[in-house]
């Protein structure tokens, strides 16, 4: 069974009244290469930026190795008036009955016949689902009591995390940007060294050794003394990938790494990423490169209008799309 290292539950991001991400849930397993595809404006880049807290999510839970590093439920963002809240409360009451009934069915079957070992994981999952519904903040307020509702809205907790904690998360979930985010006046080697000495407090010699190792792995060993502004776009992206690797992250987040490149440079970067995928490092890649998604990723997620519309293995997504929206997207992309 694969180890889930990043768990995303009901992640939402609002900019004012604009809902950019709407209840995104996704499990990321160790060694996954996940391609996030979808039209421009579907929330893909915002999703990545929320994962390592470059953007503060509005609500949801983000857990790394089962330990939440972001967890908040904001009633005031979801239920703009009392009537909406009452509807939500009624919905969760029904969900509570449904999950409780499901749990009872599995437990009774197991009591009757303990040889049915396959029921154990079902019971465990049913308990988890029941507790999740029961502990939802919506269920903790009596919806007949308007005063209690108003008080709860005022007492909605705000998200609190220190910069030190954010920096720690970013050493595990490192971002590679489409715009490179390199220091133009530094040389290639120093860009990779600086990331380590500032973030991980490694000594210079150790950082230099690690930088040379990863620059060699992306075929940039002959340009280590070049200034960043002397490189092509493809070479800059390779340096950005090497810099990310120097931090020794468990997950690398790629935000459209080839979109700012000339066509002839795209293959240069994609080949480095393909080679990287064979090492077993976990990657989440926002991309418009359908061949990469089809041939390198082991999971493809299609997003549209802030939702995950479909997800699955590449063959499942590309050869047997279930929704008309994905079919239309693939038809346009294939032209």
Language-model features: locations:
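Helix-to-loop junction immediately C-terminal to a conserved catalytic motif
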Residues: 52
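Conserved ABC transporter NBD signature motif
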Residues: 60-71, 77, 142-157
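Conserved signature/switch motifs of ABC ATPase nucleotide-binding domains
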Residues: 226, 247, 279
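Conserved ABC ATPase signature
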Residues: 227-231, 235
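Catalytic Walker B motif of ABC-type/P-loop ATPase nucleotide-binding domains
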Residues: 252-255
